[in-house]
Amino acid sequence: MEKKETKNDAEKNNKQDNKSTKSQKKENLNLVNSDKKITELENEISNLKDLYLRKQAEFENFRKRLEKEKDNFVKFANETIMKDVVNFLDNLERAINSSRKSKDFDNLLTGISMIENEILSIFDKKYNLKKFGENGENFDPSRHEAISIEEKEDLKNPEIVEVYQKGYCYNDRILRTAKVKVAQSKN
């Protein structure tokens, strides 16, 4: 009977060894799979860190480029208007040189008036800069500054009788009010 028990014990031990070996193999397989997964995740983290750093560098380069473009825009924003001003200066120089030769005041006055009209016309058309403040206009305190006042008979509305300095507006925004003398009714 002892032989049977020993045989049974041996079979039981053999079965337990098989279970134990299978369990160890399974654990080893799980460890290998876990190690592979850890390696994959570490690689993915490394790739994401690298991508993050590259995107951060790209963004910094973009920000610097945008700042440089903004600086250039501000620096050269008035280039078009400066080209027009240079043309006006050329015309003034021609008028002055011509009047030095001929000593003709009337021609100088005509030339300067033509240059003024050219300047006002180009500034109006290209830049929407308008001059205002004429004799006979109704006085508007938002557009005109009354430097002096005189009284007149039978005026319905205060009006401009003399302009000391013209006013200018740019895109409907007042740059400078016109400085004027205003007539108002005595009544």
From Swiss-Prot:
Gene3D superfamilies, A to Z: 3.90.20.20, Head domain of nucleotide exchange factor GrpE
Main location class: cytoplasm
CDD domains, sorted: GrpE
One GO CC annotation: cytoplasm
Disordered: region residues: 1-31
Entry annotated with the keyword Oxidoreductase: no
Localization per Swiss-Prot or TrEMBL: Cytoplasm
Swiss-Prot/TrEMBL GO biological process terms: protein folding
Pfam families, alphabetized: GrpE
InterPro entries tied to this protein: GrpE, GrpE_coiled_coil, GrpE_head
GO terms for MF: adenyl-nucleotide exchange factor activity; protein homodimerization activity; protein-folding chaperone binding; unfolded protein binding
Keywords: Chaperone, Cytoplasm, Stress response
Main function: Participates actively in the response to hyperosmotic and heat shock by preventing the aggregation of stress-denatured proteins, in association with DnaK and GrpE. It is the nucleotide exchange factor for DnaK and may function as a thermosensor. Unfolded proteins bind initially to DnaJ; upon interaction with the DnaJ-bound protein, DnaK hydrolyzes its bound ATP, resulting in the formation of a stable complex. GrpE releases ADP from DnaK; ATP binding to DnaK triggers the release of the substrate protein, thus completing the reaction cycle.
Family of this protein: Belongs to the GrpE family.
Subunit structure: Homodimer.
Name by which UniProt lists this protein: Protein GrpE
